[in-house]
């Protein structure tokens, strides 16, 4: 528990004790401690007096006064208590206790803010999972940035996390990919009798694959149609996945598992899943197809598993895959999906319920659309290729750090306009530049301090820190651990980027109000230690969203 949570908990305990001493209530409702929007109303505030009105059958201001009269303020660093408005109890603290966060941050270093105990909860986080049929685009980029940041945050909060990419390598789109490669392969050999499929892939990469295979594997032309298609399927997927993995790796996005859909067919997982569903009585035959009774579990209708022609629907391997995830010992499954998958939520949850699995263990987060904006206008196509703008092009255009940060800044369930020009600006209007510049500025000050013979020390006299802006800055540092916890609990990486902006702003305000290096050696030592704690916090926070913390800019 961090020092702010400790103070809040102590306040709650003392308020509860005061209520009992004043005989206001035997069964005490939940006591909430909030941070007032206006600092004039104290450091913390509680509305418990108004909550107790019906129970105590007294005016809320009278109740508040009774609580204050019986309150022991010695344990929570309280220097003043006021009653405001209809009965709010406002607490003003002696904020010197906040300096305790300085040695803690310095001692813990790159582990500062992280949970010290495991939650003993296994989470499988699946994200990106783009079809291996072409380049990653801006929607995939947002999914990757949010997914990787969320994984980092969950791990920092004490969860056991497995990052997984589901390779869709068994569907019709892969057959179309193989037929497209086949047409380009024979075209490179001078045979134009193999036509591109109507919904084939016409990108330059497919032409290059065809040419490359024609040179390296001329023998493929003599294969049977079935064997040739199988070969092109595998080679096409391998080529696209190699390129995709390189793009993600360069984007600082990594996975523990690359799970192949084909494996579900090869190891019998799909057949076993269907048999289990049938055995449990949740499948039935109608209109020549096999259906799953998902409407028994809040889906709006039942879903087809096997079509009239004997082929599986897309839903069938997805069901087997999610059952497989549960059987691997995962307590919680989190899927990050594109906006076009919204209709999948209830059916996937229902499929797990058929196995007796609580559907609340599956969390599906829908990623809304991103618009790329330049000079106030939407940019839909690449000037270079004439196709949709790729992740690679975005990285080249604005840089990896800016791309990662901007794509994580907003709640995933909200639409987002990515301003390409702003992302490249070297000004305080650019959020990533503003945050990184704060870190670089601190590094510069620490370097100057070292040149003057002043080293970072946890033994500095922190009573020298009494500037209001310094106290505000320490409050933000002290909130880091609870911010990680909140971002993890709500699966909301943007809470961390919001925190980074607030922390950077608090530092810049302090820097503009107070000189760090002065003739007062003891005060300088205290401030140097404090800004090192801020630097560590900024570094750790930026790392959680996959962004570097430069020492100079």
From Swiss-Prot:
Would the keyword Coiled coil turn up in this protein's UniProt record? no
Location of motif 'HIGH' region in this chain is 130-140
User: One Gene Ontology cellular component annotation?
Assistant: cytoplasm
Tell me a Gene Ontology molecular-function term this record carries.
Answer: arginine-tRNA ligase activity
Q: Which SMART domains match?
A: Arg_tRNA_synt_N, DALR_1
Catalytic activity, as annotated: tRNA(Arg) + L-arginine + ATP = L-arginyl-tRNA(Arg) + AMP + diphosphate
- Give the keywords, sorted: Aminoacyl-tRNA synthetase, ATP-binding, Cytoplasm, Ligase, Nucleotide-binding, Protein biosynthesis
What's a Pfam family this protein contains? DALR_1
| Chief place where the protein resides | cytoplasm
Compartments annotated for it: namely: Cytoplasm
Checking InterPro entries in the record gives:
aa-tRNA-synth_I_CS, Arg-tRNA-ligase, Arg-tRNA-synth_N, Arg-tRNA-synth_N_sf, ArgRS_core, DALR_anticod-bd, Rossmann-like_a/b/a_fold, tRNAsynth_Ia_anticodon-bd
GO terms of biological process kind: arginyl-tRNA aminoacylation
What CDD domains does this protein map onto? Anticodon_Ia_Arg (cd07956), ArgRS_core (cd00671)
EC no. given is: 6.1.1.19
Top EC class of this enzyme: ligase
Gene3D superfamilies reported in the protein's UniProt record: Arginyl tRNA synthetase N-terminal domain, HUPs, Isoleucyl-tRNA Synthetase, Domain 1
Q: Record's HAMAP family?
A: Arg_tRNA_synth
Q: How does the annotation summarize its subunit structure?
A: Monomer.
Say which family it is in.
Belongs to the class-I aminoacyl-tRNA synthetase family.
**Name this protein carries in UniProt:** Arginine--tRNA ligase
Species name for this entry? Staphylococcus epidermidis (strain ATCC 12228 / FDA PCI 1200)
């Amino acid at each position: 528990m961090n020092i702010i949570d400790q103070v809040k908990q102590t306040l709650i305990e003392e308020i509860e004790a005061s209520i009992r001493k004043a005989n206001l209530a035997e069964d005490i409702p939940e006591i909430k401690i909030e941070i007032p929007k206006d600092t004039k109303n104290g450091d913390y505030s509680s509305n418990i007096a108004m909550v107790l009105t019906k129970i105590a059958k007294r005016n809320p201001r009278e109740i508040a006064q009774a609580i204050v009269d019986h309150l022991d303020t010695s344990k929570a660093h309280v220097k003043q208590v006021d009653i405001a408005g209809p009965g709010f109890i406002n607490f003003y603290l002696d904020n010197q206790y906040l300096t305790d966060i300085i040695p803690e941050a310095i001692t813990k270093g790159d582990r500062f803010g992280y949970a010290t105990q495991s939650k003993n909860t296994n989470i499988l986080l699946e994200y990106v999972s783009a079809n291996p049929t072409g380049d990653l685009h801006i929607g995939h980029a947002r999914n990757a940035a949010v997914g990787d940041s969320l994984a980092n945050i969950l791990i920092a909060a004490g969860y056991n996390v497995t990052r997984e990419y589901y390779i869709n390598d068994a569907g019709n789109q892969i057959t179309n990919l193989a037929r497209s490669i086949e047409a380009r392969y024979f075209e490179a050999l001078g045979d134009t009798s193999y036509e591109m499929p109507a919904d084939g892939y016409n990108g330059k990469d497919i032409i290059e694959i065809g040419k490359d295979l024609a040179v390296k594997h001329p023998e493929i032309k003599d294969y049977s149609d079935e064997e040739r298609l199988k070969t092109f399927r595998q080679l096409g997927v391998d080529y696209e996945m190699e390129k995709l993995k390189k793009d993600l790796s360069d984007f600082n996005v990594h996975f523990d598992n690359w799970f192949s859909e084909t494996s579900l067919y090869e190891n019998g997982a799909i057949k076993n899943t269907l048999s289990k569903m049938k055995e449990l009585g949740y499948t039935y035959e109608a209109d020549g197809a096999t259906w799953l009774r998902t409407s028994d579990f809040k889906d709006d209708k039942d879903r087809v598993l096997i079509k009239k022609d004997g082929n599986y629907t897309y839903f069938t391997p997805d069901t087997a895959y999610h059952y497989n995830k549960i059987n691997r010992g995962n307590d919680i499954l989190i899927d990050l999906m594109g906006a076009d998958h919204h209709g999948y939520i209830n059916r996937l949850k229902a499929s797990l319920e058929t196995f007796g699995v609580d559907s609340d263990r599956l969390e599906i987060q829908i990623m809304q659309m991103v618009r790329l904006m330049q000079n106030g206008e939407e940019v839909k196509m690449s000037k270079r290729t004439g196709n949709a703008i790729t992740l690679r092009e975005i990285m080249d255009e604005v840089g990896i750090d800016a791309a990662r940060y901007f794509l994580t800044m907003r709640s995933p369930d909200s639409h987002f306009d990515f301003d390409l020009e702003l992302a490249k600006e070297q000004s305080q209007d650019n959020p990533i530049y503003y945050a990184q510049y704060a870190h670089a500025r601190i590094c510069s000050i620490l370097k100057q301090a070292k040149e003057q013979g002043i080293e970072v020390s946890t033994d500095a006299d922190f009573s020298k820190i009494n500037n209001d802006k310094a106290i505000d800055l320490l409050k933000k540092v002290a909130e880091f651990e609870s911010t990680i916890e909140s971002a993890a609990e709500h699966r909301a990486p943007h809470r961390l980027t919001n925190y980074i902006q607030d922390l950077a702003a608090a530092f810049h305000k302090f820097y503009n109000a107070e000189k760090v290096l002065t003739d007062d050696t003891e005060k300088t030592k205290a401030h140097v230690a404090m800004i090192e704690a801020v630097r560590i916090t900024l570094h750790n926070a930026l790392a959680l969203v996959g962004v570097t913390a430069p020492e100079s800019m």
